[in-house]
Swiss-Prot record:
Any GO MF annotation of the entry: ribosome binding
InterPro entries from the UniProt entry: PRC_barrel-like_sf, PRC_RimM, RimM, RimM_N, RimM_N_sf, Transl_B-barrel_sf
Role description: An accessory protein needed during the final step in the assembly of 30S ribosomal subunit, possibly for assembly of the head region. Essential for efficient processing of 16S rRNA. May be needed both before and after RbfA during the maturation of 16S rRNA. It has affinity for free ribosomal 30S subunits but not for 70S ribosomes.
GO cellular component term, pick one: ribosome
Top-rank lineage group of the source organism: Bacteria
Domain PRC barrel: 91-162
Main location, first listed in the record: cytoplasm
Stated name of the protein: Ribosome maturation factor RimM
Gene Ontology biological process: ribosomal small subunit biogenesis; rRNA processing
Amino acid sequence: MEYIAVAEVLNTHGIKGCLKMRPLTDNIERFDEDICYYLGDKKVKVTIQNYRMYKGFLYIDFEEFNDINEVLGFKKQYLYIDEKDRYELKDGSFYIDDLIGLKAYFNGEYIGDLVDVISIYSNDVYVIKNDEKEFMIPAVKEFIKKIDLENGLIDVVIIEGM
């Protein structure tokens, strides 16, 4: 089974085992779904009892925990789902973990690997890095010409100053 992270545990919240998390999904409604979730490095199977969003953070209560001491060890770990429970994406949309590691090319010349995706309000920014330089490229059609997951490639446009 392959696990996909859907939230990062930042801290505990209160004394009853609630966890404060940073969502790693645009689809917050996914936490309403009756699917299996796995918590932490040991992938402990958990059931979401309740969740809420507040100021961009996700707060989740699990049926399995009702005391802060039971969840302290999960800080800086992740909440996962099984890959089979991923949403189908529209054409032209990609999961970030599928993009990481793509080989980036500009005018047919290798310029580096896609190492990170920064999500900001207007659009994502792809971070492409080689041994000497780092490029930050807006994830818009003017700069991203082609993404080929099958062959592990991304064709980009670089302008002066990137």
